[in-house]
Amino acid sequence: MAKKINNEYNDASIQVLEGLEAVRKRPGMYIGSTDSRGLHHLVYEIVDNAVDEALSGYGNEINVTIQKDNSICVADSGRGMPTGMHASGIPTVEVIFTVLHAGGKFGQGGYKTSGGLHGVGASVVNALSKWLEVHIVRDGVEYMERFEDGGKPVGTLKKIGKTKKRNGTSVTFLPDDTIFSTTNFSYEILAERLRESAFLLKGVKITLTDERGEEPKEEVFHYEEGIKEFVAYLNEEKDTLTPVVYFSGAKEGIEVELAYQYNDGYSENVLSFVNNVRTKDGGTHEVGMKTSMTKAYNEYARKVGLLKEKDKNLEGSDFREGLAAVLSIRVPENLLQFEGQTKGKLGTPLARTVVDNVVGEQMGFYLQENSEMSQSLIRKAIKAREAREAARKAREESRNGKKRKKGESLLSGKLTPAQSRNPKKNELYLVEGDSAGGSAKQGRDRKFQAILPLRGKVINTEKAKMQDILKNEEINTMIYTIGAGVGPEFSIEDCNYDKIIIMTDADTDGAHIQVLLLTFFYRYMKPLIEAGKVYIALPPLYKVSKGTGKKSVIEYAWTDGELAEVIDKVGKGYMLQRYKGLGEMNAEQLWETTMDPETRTLIRVRIDDAAQAERRVTTLMGDKVEPRRKWIEQHVQFTLEEDGSILDRSEEDTSAPTGESLLDAEKTKEAEQTDDTEISLFDIE
């Protein structure tokens, strides 16, 4: 449990910055979107308030309940919200829930460190709810206030009376279905987020309950070892090479915790947090950690003779191959600085120095005390350098590919290039098989669409060394075509295309190729996914036709639900064709349904939850059979006849994001310019 911080949390510590009028008009500005991601963000905002209390040492239990009517209740055992009158003349509770940017985290009064970095939590949740109720127990007295119709108080704060209940705040709300495209909460998404919070709040118990089914479902997340258990969780389905290592310390008001462990994989997985909020773009704290680790390893390598005087130092990425690490720091509000509006990157200069010192001091001793293990890790890093140099060579060759014989022979007869050389407009279609590749070549828009048929087998890059990956002809061709290098040498500025679109058959083989390609992009060209440049084409499953000649009617359907609507529209006498492969479509049909920017449907692949994405790749593509078997049993329904690809789901089914997915995706109907519909690529139910 966190050490108590002696800051007052009372009515005077609540500051008011501005009103709440704009939230319902422009909800996306406050919660990101009005799809499933935005819906779940409401829960995180209220949970973050409870986390702030726990961070400050008040309360060690948080309960989150999805109730039968799909409302959410978040209850904590903190001090209870202030219940007196605010300086503005209305109850403080009302200020917290009806005024934007009202909270105890803006001044130095309520919290020393705060997790709710945007600080708009309670009021925004209230504004976007049909109703919200807050129950407060403070100093032996219970209070309650209700809000309806987007945050309007029903009466005022009511004093219910004396109680023996413990202090705390309970917030229950029902999201407004006129604002959100879905109001169905995903148990899995909430579980993943709450598990992460519990790992970071050592000793705090977080309980998630789902009352919607016939039998209530409940999970308790409680980790006495904190981020040490988080790292073990990240590596749960991998073969590990070391125990979990843990360092902690504090300097100049900044608290530092680092846990890490090596596995036998070839990629690094570093998750960093500031005040319990994920910094997905890293920042000064992450730089400090990486710098100090690299320095400690190189100094030790020279001390034991694994690096000679004439040898160059190993690079940080060499030491981080197979590393799973969690860095969590607590920074006082007065030192907190972020780069950019998303607050995904820490900018506090002092954080780098503090993390560097704390980690550097302890790591030097640790390497000496664990000499045998340390030397084996350095030998591993030397092998990683060899792979990195091979990757750099591949990148250099891909940059000069058109001038080099190797590049020309690799691409000859495979790539059908676009006429334009504008990387901001060009699209690359990775197409399964020659027959579909032929139709795509004929049907494409030559100006900006390039076609690369995949003829041979794509290697499973999760299990392979870099040298073996670079020997795979299909992978090598993609590297040359994309033109931005691979692995640590990848540079998105050199990418030849704005969109890289995977186009496969709607069957098991097609789905497998999608997974293999996404695994490669995730492991070795991750910036492509982070920049939103990787897509999956969604060809139709059905063609419904009627009549011939000029009077003929042709309609397409992407799901069984759409098929029923199309059949009603076409009427009696229709002919039904079920597409089993892209090759069954002629060039015109392929263009019209799958390649024309005016009419096609694309799925943009996205990573929302880095820890979950890492585990999902390992589960589906790694060496261990048992985790994969269990996941398939839980998520794949087997039928006597194949119903199509894993993407063959109705929009209603696919609106939920990433609780159990490897990577997330957004479905974009480009012609309509509507809000993106979010789906999970491997979230199969």
Swiss-Prot record:
Zinc-finger in keyword set: no
One of the protein's GO biological processes: DNA topological change
Segments traversing the membrane: none
GO function terms (MF aspect): ATP binding; DNA binding; DNA negative supercoiling activity; metal ion binding
Binding positions (Mg(2+) 2): D505, D507
Disordered as annotated region, ranges: 389-427, 644-685
Pfam families per record: DNA_gyraseB, DNA_gyraseB_C, HATPase_c, Toprim
Cofactor dependence: Mg(2+); Mn(2+); Ca(2+)
GO terms for cellular component: chromosome
Biased composition (Basic and acidic residues): 389-400
Keywords: DNA-binding, Isomerase, Magnesium, Metal-binding
Note on how the cofactor is bound: Binds two Mg(2+) per subunit. The magnesium ions form salt bridges with both the protein and the DNA. Can also accept other divalent metal cations, such as Mn(2+) or Ca(2+).
Enzyme class: isomerase
Source superkingdom: Bacteria
Reactions it catalyzes: ATP-dependent breakage, passage and rejoining of double-stranded DNA
UniProt feature, compositional bias: Acidic residues: 644-654, 673-685
Activity regulation as described: Pyrrolopyrimidines inhibit both GyrB and its paralog in topoisomerase IV (parE).
Binding site for Mg(2+) 1: E432, D505
Gene3D superfamilies: 3.30.230.10, 3.40.50.670, Histidine kinase-like ATPase, C-terminal domain
Domain Toprim: 426-540
Enzyme nomenclature, EC number: 5.6.2.2
Function of the molecule: Topoisomerase IV is essential for chromosome segregation. It relaxes supercoiled DNA. Performs the decatenation events required during the replication of a circular DNA molecule.
Name listed for the protein in its UniProt record: DNA topoisomerase 4 subunit B
Organism this protein belongs to: Enterococcus faecalis (strain ATCC 700802 / V583)
Gene: parE
